[in-house]
Structure formats: structure tokens, C-alpha cells
Amino acid sequence: FKVKTRFSQEHELTVLGLGAIDDMKLNTETDPEDESKQYLLNYLPTIKQNTYTLGAVYKHYSGNHTQTVVLSRSFMNNSNIKYRDNDESSTDNLTLRLKSDEIENHLRFENRSLVGLFDLTAGFNVDYAVYRNNTFQRAFTDIPKEIRYKTDLGLFKWGIFVTSGYKSADDRFSASFGF
């Protein structure tokens, strides 16, 4: 969805979102004589996944200046599971159980000013991301072994930026600089 509202000449708000739900299952009714299909059936896990992204952009117009505030959040949840020979009757047959989440939150502010033939933009951003993973995997080699790991990671980042652009009156020359 996308909703854009102009409250007045100076104030504008846009809100948008996108989401998906995936529930993938194995087609166990395939031809048992088809080796390539049986290989895939025995190799691929069942996957459940859901994702969404939500965001909002507020703009304030003031003559040659525009202030913009952007706030967004993205989320992905993923779950994979696999049983040996697709036999779910016992946990002894479990070969893979993976659950993970990825979450990102973003905030950005910028001010854009048009001064003659120059375009000046400055601002800052603050982001926080989380990654979680809990995995169990049973590997069958010469000696069967179990692999287990768990991750819970949070990352904070921030930044500032400034850019300046110039475009000649006849549009034959342009230049920009920023950091």
C-alpha cells in the first residue's frame, strides 16, 4: 500500500508498506522412479517465511528549503525444517531446524536548500539492526555429528552527510561533491 497526504502547501506525508507470507511445502506425491525429483525431495527443506517493510516520509516545504524525515522498519522471519526421508514421525529423523529473524529500523533527517545554481543537502541518519538465528543441523558423514549455534546480534550505526551540487544555467555543465 501507499498513501500520500498533502496537509497544506508546506506539509506532506507518505506512508507505505509491503509484506509477504511464504509457506512452501514439498510435493511428496512425485514419481518415485524419477531420481532427479527424488533427490530434490530428499534434499530441500520445507520453508516458512514472512516479511514486511513499513515506512513513512514527512516533508516540510519552506521556499527554497525542504526538510525531510524518513522512518522505516523491515522485518524478515525465516524457518526451515528437514527430516531424513521426509519422515516426521520421530525427532531422531530431524536433520535441520533453522529459525532466524532480521529486523532493521532506520531514521533519517535531511535539509535540502536551493541557492541560485547550487543544491545543498545535509543531514544525519540513525539505524538499528537485529539478527537472530537458532540452528540445529545433523550431518551424516563417516561419523554423524550435530551442529548447533545461536546468534543474537544487535548493531547500531549512525552517520552524517553533506552534498553540494552545481548545474550551469544552460545545463551543459554539472558537478557535485559530498561526504
Regions found by a protein language model. Give the residues of each.
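Acidic/polar loop-and-plug regions of large Gram-negative outer-membrane beta-barrel proteins
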Residues: 16-45
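Face-selective signature of the C-terminal outer-membrane beta-barrel domain
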Residues: 5-22, 45-179
